[in-house]
């Protein structure tokens, strides 16, 4: 449901794909902050150097927000990559739904794959090349929760995933970053 323009502002996070990864698509976070403010977003903050931007806006339609951010990135930086936008409510729901054992074992890596609305379905699992012998993948609305033991990382199919066309409609954050983003969004909502 889309709120009218008279709605109270909401807190969102934009998760950019492929920014500042492997020396590609280098953009300073201070420049991104200014660009987000330039298109009308307020209370803009960034977290780490990999394209996590928290902002406030009266627009409540994530698809419209994704489009607005993508257009700005294309115009100002020449980037054609897709963006995933999540509301504070969606991030809180995600963090609450994480398996209880996640983050309890430092011998495992835990990642959250954020899905764009175009592929947000449990059926997406059938299209992805996961190695069930070493990777655990669970669907949650809007995300795939991926985990593997560190000793098996080289046996996972994570690298194969990045070459799939469907990968263009998702972006990955590790568990710590995901939790921190939710925490920062809650803090932004209180100010």
Give, region by region, the residue ranges found by the protein language model.
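Surface-exposed, charge/polar-rich loops and edge strands
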Residues: 3-50, 54-191
């Amino acid at each position: 449901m889309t709120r009218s323009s008279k709605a109270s502002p909401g807190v969102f996070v934009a998760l950019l794909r492929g920014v500042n990864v492997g020396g590609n698509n280098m953009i300073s976070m201070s420049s991104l902050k200014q660009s987000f403010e330039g298109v009308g977003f307020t209370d803009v903050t960034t977290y780490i150097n990999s394209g996590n931007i928290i902002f406030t806006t009266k627009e409540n339609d994530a698809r419209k927000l994704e489009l607005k951010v993508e257009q700005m990135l294309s115009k100002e930086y020449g980037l054609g990559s897709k963006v995933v936008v999540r509301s504070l409510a969606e991030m809180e729901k995600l963090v609450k739904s994480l398996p209880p054992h996640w983050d309890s074992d430092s011998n495992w890596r835990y990642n959250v794959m954020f899905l764009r609305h175009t592929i947000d379905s449990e059926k997406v699992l059938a299209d992805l090349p996961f190695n069930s012998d070493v990777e655990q993948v669970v669907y949650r609305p809007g995300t795939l929760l991926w985990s593997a033991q560190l000793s098996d990382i080289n046996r996972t199919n994570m690298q194969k995933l990045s070459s799939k066309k469907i990968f263009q409609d998702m972006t990955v954050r590790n568990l710590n970053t995901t939790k921190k983003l939710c925490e920062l969004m809650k803090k932004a909502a209180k100010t």
